[in-house]
């Protein structure tokens, strides 16, 4: 580290290396001596002209910081880069918290948490109380485990204890994502958070950097509009209001890829199709999830649908994000034709919690199926045929049934 003064400027030169990673900072700022002497004593303007280099890729930091005694700091900063990569930085952070005593402490903390969305306090209190803006313009940004995002643009506006991120946008695969984020009263015990946006025109295959994922296709569209408050992920989830919609088009998904979805996803997949483990691939025709949330209660009324080359699947029920309890009934229907009248899907339900999901028996489904079979015997099969026809009519187009107009989720999502 080198600091050298000259006139009203201080030149900074920093070079750091760790393993295969290197970090450098070079450039000039207003005299460090002047900053130390004048901060909160007299009006001060700090000019910043720095070049931050991470593994050979540079991020330019330009702008001014203003400090008037007894007033909040104000600033106007621009971050610009042709190509920057956060992969090693994020990986290094993960490694740092997975080593030695920190790892053991983190492990014990995780074991104690009974919620999928944990109760750890988010570091909102570390955000600065200030006035100003930060403009971000990065042509290509590398992130772990996915293709780089391109043309990243955003404007962050700070106003006391409120931060707005407006016109946040970037290219994703062959598509584009954009949205807005607002965080208010972040120094309080119940900060309020609102997010809205959408992403479209990309495929799952395009955004996965790992060719070993064995995924092809999967035209994807996402839209969301959510509001909540709280200082932890659990509080934010349990108080959430709004809507989320996701749709995925035709895709081929390796079983090994689906198994990375976590306990909840695996439990759903195994409940829908217990024989899937014998196949190394799922041929997806479409999947749609429309999830309205009211005070942390996710209601699913034929609003999650999946179609594969072999099955049509519909989900009904609720997920309570307050206690994270799951109460979902699964209705899978084979495409091979009529069954014997026993809707096996109606006998399956997802239960437990997001942290510890399990599949079980839908008692109401057992009774209904028994009644159907009994009536079928008495009517010579007419009741069974009627029940099958009804099931086919209501469950034969799960994706189309689940999908809502995109403009109902958030403006501009069409």
Predicted segment positions?
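Terminal amphipathic helices with adjacent charged low-complexity linkers/tails
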Residues: 93-97
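Outer-membrane beta-barrel proteins
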Residues: 23-25, 86-90, 147, 204-208, ...
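Extracellular loop and loop/strand-boundary signature of outer-membrane beta-barrel proteins
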Residues: 36, 122, 140, 208-212
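Repeat-solenoid scaffold signature
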Residues: 42-76, 206, 210-241
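Surface-exposed, gly/pro-biased binding rims or lids
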Residues: 207-212, 331-364
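Solvent-exposed beta-strand/coil patches in large extracellular/periplasmic or lumenal scaffold regions
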Residues: 1-24, 28, 49, 101-198, ...
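Extended amphipathic ligand-handling, pore-lining, and cofactor/metal-binding catalytic surfaces
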Residues: 246, 358, 366-367, 373
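Short hydrophobic membrane-inserting alpha-helices and related fusion/pore-forming segments
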Residues: 369-389
